[in-house]
């Protein structure tokens, strides 16, 4: 087994909730991260957007608060997802979510 763990904080830019055909509750948010980090002794601006998927009943209480503008910290694993048009992207599957605001 190899390690696949990511912790990322940021601001939700959009959110949607739905139930799968199997009846599993899902919340999908777009998380925008902005920070500054040192790399090779130089300060660098860091920016990314990543889709975050929260699946299952244990996220029901937090999911109702996940709206655009809310700051969160997410811990989970990343997985490659292929869209209907064949585009690949990394998606963060949440295992823990903390509201920051």
Swiss-Prot record:
<dbReference type="Pfam" id="PF22657">
    <property type="entry name" value="SSB_1"/>
</dbReference>
<protein>
    <recommendedName>
        <fullName>Replication restart protein PriB</fullName>
    </recommendedName>
</protein>
<keyword id="KW-0235">DNA replication</keyword>
<dbReference type="GO" id="GO:1990077">
    <property type="term" value="C:primosome complex"/>
</dbReference>
<feature type="domain" description="SSB">
    <location>
        <begin position="1"/>
        <end position="101"/>
    </location>
</feature>
<keyword id="KW-0238">DNA-binding</keyword>
<dbReference type="InterPro" id="IPR012340">
    <property type="entry name" value="NA-bd_OB-fold"/>
</dbReference>
<dbReference type="InterPro" id="IPR000424">
    <property type="entry name" value="Primosome_PriB/ssb"/>
</dbReference>
<comment type="function">
    <text>Involved in the restart of stalled replication forks, which reloads the replicative helicase on sites other than the origin of replication; the PriA-PriB pathway is the major replication restart pathway. During primosome assembly it facilitates complex formation between PriA and DnaT on DNA; stabilizes PriA on DNA. Stimulates the DNA unwinding activity of PriA helicase.</text>
</comment>
<dbReference type="InterPro" id="IPR023646">
    <property type="entry name" value="Prisomal_replication_PriB"/>
</dbReference>
<dbReference type="GO" id="GO:0006269">
    <property type="term" value="P:DNA replication, synthesis of primer"/>
</dbReference>
<keyword id="KW-0639">Primosome</keyword>
<comment type="subunit">
    <text>Homodimer. Interacts with PriA and DnaT. Component of the replication restart primosome. Primosome assembly occurs via a 'hand-off' mechanism. PriA binds to replication forks, subsequently PriB then DnaT bind; DnaT then displaces ssDNA to generate the helicase loading substrate.</text>
</comment>
<dbReference type="GO" id="GO:0003697">
    <property type="term" value="F:single-stranded DNA binding"/>
</dbReference>
<comment type="similarity">
    <text>Belongs to the PriB family.</text>
</comment>
């Amino acid at each position: 087994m190899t390690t696949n763990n990511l912790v990322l904080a940021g601001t939700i830019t959009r959110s949607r909730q739905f139930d799968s055909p199997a009846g599993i509750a899902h919340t999908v948010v777009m998380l925008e991260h902005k920070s500054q980090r040192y790399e090779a002794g130089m300060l660098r601006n860091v920016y990314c957007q990543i889709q975050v998927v929260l699946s299952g009943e244990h996220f029901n209480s937090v999911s109702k608060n996940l709206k655009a503008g809310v700051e969160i910290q997410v811990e989970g694993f990343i997985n490659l997802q292929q869209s209907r048009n064949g585009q690949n992207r990394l998606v963060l599957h949440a295992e823990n979510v903390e509201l920051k605001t």
